[in-house]
C-alpha cells in the first residue's frame, strides 16, 4: 500500500527501530485465496515445433543462407516435370485440392411462389435481382460466402430469411459434391524449389544460398508415433556451378552441430529418387548425447536426421536451370523430438488432444487449484478470521470446556463479540487435525500435519496450498458472522467437527484438478478431527 515518505523519514529520525518494525503495516496481507501459489506470474511458452523452427531459421541465417518462401500449392504437371517416371508414385501420396462446382440454378414459377412465401411478395423486380445474383455466383463474380449477403442487400431483407430461402428453395446447393482439381498440396519442399529457382534466374545470377522452413503434406496410410500427414520441412539449396556432394556434408555438419550433434555418418540412400543425380542422394546419420540410453530405438545415440543430394540436370532442365543445385532437407518434428525429449510426434505436435498425449499436472499446478470457499467480505470480517486463528494457535492445547475472547468491534453496523469455544468436556480447544496443511504430493491433494513423517511433502513450497484447516474454518466463521450481522441475529455459532471431505472444512478443489485426479486414480484426502467452534454475540 502507499505511504508518505516524508512522514516515514520524520518518524525514523525520532525512533528508527519503531518505524522500521511498523513497516510491516505498509505491506498488504493477502487473503487466503490471494496467497502463493494461487498468486502466480504466468509466462507464455513456445510450441516445441515452432521453437525448433525458429532455432533452425537462426541457424541457417548464421550460415549465410537467405530465407525464401516456396509455393505451397503445386500443379500436378510440375510433379511430372520434376519426378519423371516416379511422378505417379509421388502423386499417389499427394493431397489434391477440390472445390464445389457452381450449379446453374433456374427459377421456375413453383420456385417463385416458394420464394415469395418465405421472403414476402418481392415482385418481378425482386425475382430478377435474385436471378442476377445467382448468375453472378455461377460466373464466379460472387463468392460462395457472399451469396447470402448479396441477395439480402439486393432485396433489403434479413440474412436469416435469405439463408432459409436458399436451403428450402434451392436444394441443389446441399447436394453439391466436391470436384478435384489438378492442384496439389506439396509433399516435398523440392516441388517448390524447382519453381522458385527457375523463376529467380530471370532476375538474378547464381550462386544462391537459400533456405525455407514450411509445411508439407503427405497422404500417409495412417499416422503413428513417427509420422503425420502434415509436417514441417527445413530445406536448403545451394545453386553453384561448382557445388558437390561435399557441400551437402558440410552444410549438414554446420547446421546440426548448432543443435548438439557431435558425430556424423553419410550413407548412400537406397531410394535413388529420379530428381537427384545418381549416387548423390545421401542419408545423414548424426550422434546426439541426449539420445544415449533413451527409451527409443536410438538409444545408442545415432539417428537418421537429414537427406541431401544434387538435383538431376534432367529435372533442372525442365525449368531452364543451367547450374547444379545441392538440396538438403530434414523434418522439423524429428529434430524437435530430440530437443524436447518427446517419444511420440503426435503428443509433441498436438499435446492438447487427449488421444495423442498423456495429461500431466505437476504438484505445483494442482496446488494452484485449491481454494477457500467462503471468505469474509469486509475488513472487519478478515480481522475476525485472523483473530480466531490467533486464539487457536495460542490456546489450542487448553483443556475443555473453555472459551477465549478473540475479537470485539462493529461488523456491518452491529456491535459483536467473537469468542473461540469448545463446550464439550475432556477434550481440547482444538482437535489434533486443526493445524493440518493442504499440500499436493505425488499427484495427491492431502491435508496433513507438518511433521517428520511428511517431511518430503513439505520440501516443495510451490506445492503447498498455503491453507491450514483452521484458517479455512476461520474464514467460514467470519463470513457467517458477517451474514448473521446483516440478518439481525442475536447470536451465531459456527462449529467444525470431524472432517471427511474438503467441503466440510470450507475448502474447494478446482474442477480441472478434480478431473485430473479422477482420471489418474489419484486421491483428495482431507480428513481429521478439528473440533472447535466460534461464537458471535451481537448487541
UniProtKB/Swiss-Prot annotation:
In terms of superkingdom, the source organism counts as Archaea
Xref: Pfam families: SepRS_C, tRNA-synt_2d
Q: What is its EC number?
A: 6.1.1.27
Keyword rRNA processing listed? The answer is no
Q: Which family does it belong to?
A: Belongs to the class-II aminoacyl-tRNA synthetase family. O-phosphoseryl-tRNA(Cys) synthetase subfamily.
Query: An example Gene Ontology cellular component term from the record?
Result: cytoplasm
Q: How does it assemble?
A: Homotetramer. Interacts with SepCysS.
Q: Which cysteines are joined by disulfide bonds?
A: none
Q: What EC class does the entry list?
A: ligase
Instruction: Quote the Gene3D superfamilies the UniProt record gives.
Output: Bira Bifunctional Protein, Domain 2
This protein's name:
O-phosphoserine--tRNA(Cys) ligase
GO MF terms here are:
ATP binding; phenylalanine-tRNA ligase activity; phosphoserine-tRNA(Cys) ligase activity; tRNA binding
Q: What reactions does this protein catalyze?
A: tRNA(Cys) + O-phospho-L-serine + ATP = O-phospho-L-seryl-tRNA(Cys) + AMP + diphosphate
Q: So where does substrate get bound?
A: 188-190, 233-235, 275-276, 327
Q: What does this protein do?
A: Catalyzes the attachment of O-phosphoserine (Sep) to tRNA(Cys).
| Record has Aminoacyl-tRNA synthetase as a keyword | yes
One GO term (biological process): phenylalanyl-tRNA aminoacylation
Tell me which SUPFAM superfamilies the record gives.
Class II aaRS and biotin synthetases
- Annotated keywords: Aminoacyl-tRNA synthetase, ATP-binding, Ligase, Nucleotide-binding, Protein biosynthesis
The cross-references to InterPro entries, in alphabetical order and at most eight, read:
aa-tRNA-synth_II (IPR006195), aa-tRNA-synth_II/BPL/LPL (IPR045864), O-Pseryl-tRNA(Cys)_ligase (IPR005246), Phenylalanyl-tRNA_Synthase (IPR002319), SepRS_C (IPR041590)
Amino acid at each position: 500500500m502507499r505511504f508518505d515518505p516524508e512522514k516515514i523519514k520524520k518518524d525514523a529520525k525520532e525512533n528508527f527501530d519503531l518505524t522500521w518494525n511498523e513497516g510491516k503495516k505498509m505491506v498488504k496481507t493477502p487473503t487466503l485465496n490471494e496467497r502463493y501459489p494461487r498468486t502466480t506470474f504466468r509466462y507464455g511458452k513456445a510450441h516445441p515445433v515452432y521453437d525448433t523452427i525458429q532455432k533452425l531459421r537462426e541457424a541457417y541465417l548464421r550460415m549465410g543462407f537467405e530465407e525464401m518462401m516456396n509455393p505451397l500449392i503445386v500443379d500436378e504437371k510440375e510433379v511430372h516435370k520434376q519426378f519423371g517416371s516416379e511422378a505417379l508414385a509421388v502423386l499417389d501420396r499427394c493431397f489434391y485440392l477440390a472445390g464445389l462446382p457452381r450449379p446453374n440454378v433456374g427459377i421456375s414459377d413453383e420456385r417463385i411462389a416458394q420464394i415469395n412465401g418465405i421472403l414476402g411478395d418481392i415482385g418481378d423486380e425482386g425475382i430478377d435481382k435474385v436471378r442476377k445474383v445467382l448468375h453472378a455466383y455461377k460466373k464466379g463474380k460472387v463468392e460462395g460466402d457472399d451469396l447470402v449477403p448479396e441477395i439480402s442487400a439486393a432485396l433489403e431483407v434479413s440474412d436469416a430469411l435469405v439463408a432459409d430461402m436458399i436451403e428450402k428453395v434451392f436444394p441443389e446447393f446441399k447436394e453439391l459434391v466436391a470436384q478435384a482439381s489438378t492442384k496439389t498440396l506439396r509433399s516435398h519442399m523440392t516441388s517448390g524449389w524447382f519453381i522458385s529457382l527457375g523463376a529467380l534466374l530471370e532476375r538474378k545470377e547464381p550462386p544462391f544460398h537459400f533456405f525455407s522452413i514450411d509445411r508439407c503434406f503427405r497422404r500417409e496410410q495412417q499416422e503413428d508415433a513417427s509420422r503425420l500427414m502434415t509436417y514441417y520441412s527445413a530445406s536448403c539449396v545451394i545453386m553453384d556451378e561448382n557445388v558437390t556432394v561435399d557441400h551437402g556434408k558440410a552444410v549438414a555438419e554446420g547446421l546440426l552441430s548448432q543443435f548438439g550433434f557431435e558425430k556424423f555418418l553419410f550413407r548412400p540412400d537406397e531410394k535413388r529418387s529420379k530428381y537427384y543425380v545418381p549416387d548423390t542422394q545421401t542419408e545423414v546419420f548424426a550422434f546426439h548425447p541426449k539420445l544415449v540410453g533413451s527409451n527409443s530405438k536410438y538409444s545408442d545415440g545415432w539417428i537418421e536426421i537429414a537427406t541431401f543430394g544434387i538435383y538431376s540436370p534432367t529435372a533442372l532442365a525442365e525449368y531452364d536451370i543451367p547450374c547444379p543445385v545441392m538440396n538438403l532437407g530434414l523434418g522439423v518434428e524429428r529434430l524437435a523430438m530430440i530437443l524436447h525429449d518427446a517419444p511420440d510426434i503426435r503428443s509433441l505436435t498436438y499435446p492438447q488432444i487427449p488421444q495423442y498425449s498423456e495429461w500431466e499436472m505437476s504438484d505445483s499446478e494442482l496446488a494452484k487449484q485449491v481454494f477457500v470457499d467462503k471468505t469474509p467480505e469486509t475488513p472487519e470480517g478478515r480481522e475476525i478470521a485472523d483473530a480466531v486463528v490467533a486464539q487457536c494457535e495460542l490456546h489450542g492445547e487448553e483443556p475443555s470446556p473453555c472459551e477465549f475472547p478473540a475479537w470485539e468491534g462493529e461488523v456491518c453496523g452491529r456491535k459483536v463479540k467473537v469468542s473461540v469455544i469448545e463446550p464439550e468436556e475432556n477434550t481440547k480447544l482444538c482437535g489434533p487435525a486443526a493445524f493440518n496443511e493442504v499440500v499436493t504430493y505425488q499427484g495427491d491433494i492431502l491435508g496433513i500435519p507438518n511433521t517428520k513423517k511428511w517431511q518430503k511433502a513439505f520440501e516443495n513450497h510451490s506445492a503447498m496450498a498455503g491453507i491450514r484447516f483452521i484458517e479455512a474454518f476461520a474464514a467460514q466463521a467470519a463470513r457467517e458472522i458477517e451474514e448473521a450481522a446483516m440478518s439481525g441475529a442475536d447470536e451465531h455459532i459456527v462449529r467444525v467437527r470431524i472432517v471427511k471431505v474438503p467441503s466440510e472444512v470450507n475448502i474447494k478443489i478446482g474442477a480441472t484438478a478434480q478431473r485430473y485426479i479422477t482420471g489418474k486414480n489419484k486421491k483428495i484426502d482431507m480428513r481429521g478431527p478439528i473440533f472447535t467452534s466460534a461464537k458471535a454475540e451481537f448487541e
